[in-house]
Structures are given as C-alpha cells and as structure tokens.
C-alpha cells in the first residue's frame, strides 16, 4: 500500500488530496467494501473529524475518488472535457485513441481497477464521464458508414475496456520498467486494433491502420498525461 505522508489540517487543499490519495490506495487494494472513513483518515495521517469535515459520508468519499479517477482517465485518453465537445466520428484518430488507452492502462493499473470496480457497482454507468464518452463515441461510430452493420456499441465497449484494464494485471505492469510497459502497451493496442479492424470496422476505410498492422511491432511512444 502506498506510504502517504502525514499532512497538517492547516492546509485544506493538501489535506483533501491526502484523504483522496488514501482512499484511492484502499479502493485499489480492497474495492469499495474495504473503504471506511476511519481507515482512510488513519492512512492519510489526519483525525476522523478532519476527514468528516471534507467528506460527510463514506459514500461521498468513494464518489469523489471515482470522479477524480474518471476525470484523469478522460483527460489522458480524450483530452480536456471542457473543450472536447462531441467529436465527429470522421475526425477521431482511432489508432491514437487506442494507443492512449493502452498506455494509460499500463502506467496506471490501480486507477483502472478503481474505475472498473466503481463502474460495475454503479446503478447508472452513463453518469460516469469516461464511460459516457467512450461508449458514446463507439455508438456514434457504429451509426456511421465507417462501421460494419449491426455493431453493438455497449458490448464492444465492455470487451475493449475489460481487456485493456486486465492486460496490465496479467502482464504485471507495476513491476516493469518504462520501456517494457511501452512494449506491452504496443502489444495491447495492436491486438485491439486488429480485432476492431476485422470485426467492427470496415477495413477498406482505414488504410493507415491496415498498413500499421502489417509492420513489425515497436514500443509505443510516451503520451503526455492530461
């Protein structure tokens, strides 16, 4: 578990971040059921009263933590949510988006685990900004002439995200060097593209991806985090 330094309550912003950091560590380790305000407060180095001042209930703390993770994922994969708007399908670089998702998953397996556990427990997945944009973008793609007929955007979204977030766990990315993570990310992105290219996508519409799939693998370049 992450070793979180104690912070004084005199700095509310730093204290709030310390509490959220502790909550993220516990969520990644034990899931939502393993999070209590008292344990989070202890890990963050603050007293319970201070934790309750920032988050009145355990549920609000978990919700705030999940929102932070979702926003971080959104910025890393799609860009600034304040300026992105609804992207036109024809303008989306599918290979670049796939690469960004693969790199984020390889570099942040614990955050992806938090997000996935929270989404599975949510009564309304569409309330999550990252899921709404990811599934929504695939639905817009499925409705376009770039896709094969009959693509189920919801099922495809679950398949792609589950695979992207489980691969780093299988490959033990947390114990790998950066170069190894880049190579593992490339392998993941390559097979995601291959599955889509010859499944949901009309392959004749994507000559650049067809050409990429025919080349030898090279590690993914670093992508600036949002």
Feature-to-residue mapping (PLM):
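Helix-turn-helix
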Residues: 18, 22, 26-60, 64-65
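Alpha-helical DNA-contacting segments of helix-turn-helix folds
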Residues: 62-69, 127-130
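Amphipathic alpha-helical packing segments from all-alpha helical-bundle domains
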Residues: 74-78, 119-147, 151-159, 187-190
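Short alpha-helical scaffolding segments that buttress acidic/His motifs in well-ordered protein cores
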Residues: 101, 115-118, 160, 164, ...
């Amino acid at each position: 578990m992450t070793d979180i330094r104690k912070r004084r309550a005199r700095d509310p912003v730093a204290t709030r971040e310390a509490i959220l950091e502790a909550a993220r560590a516990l969520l990644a380790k034990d899931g939502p059921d393993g999070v209590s305000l008292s344990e989070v407060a202890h890990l963050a180095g603050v007293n319970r009263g201070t934790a309750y001042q920032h988050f009145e209930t355990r549920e609000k703390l978990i919700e705030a933590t999940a929102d932070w993770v979702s926003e971080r994922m959104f910025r890393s994969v799609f860009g600034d949510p304040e300026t992105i708007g609804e992207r036109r399908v024809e303008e989306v670089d599918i290979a670049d988006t796939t690469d960004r998702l693969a790199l984020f998953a390889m570099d942040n397996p614990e955050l992806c685990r938090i997000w996935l556990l929270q989404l599975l427990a949510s009564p309304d997945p569409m309330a999550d900004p990252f899921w709404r944009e990811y599934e929504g973008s695939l639905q817009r793609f499925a409705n376009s002439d770039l896709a094969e007929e009959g693509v189920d955007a919801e099922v495809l979204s679950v398949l792609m995200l589950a695979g992207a977030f489980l691969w780093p766990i299988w490959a033990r990315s947390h114990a790998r060097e950066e170069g190894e993570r880049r190579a593992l990310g490339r392998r993941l992105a390559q097979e995601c593209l291959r599955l889509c290219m010859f499944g949901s996508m009309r392959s004749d519409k994507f000559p650049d991806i067809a050409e990429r799939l025919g080349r030898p693998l090279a590690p993914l370049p670093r992508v600036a985090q949002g």
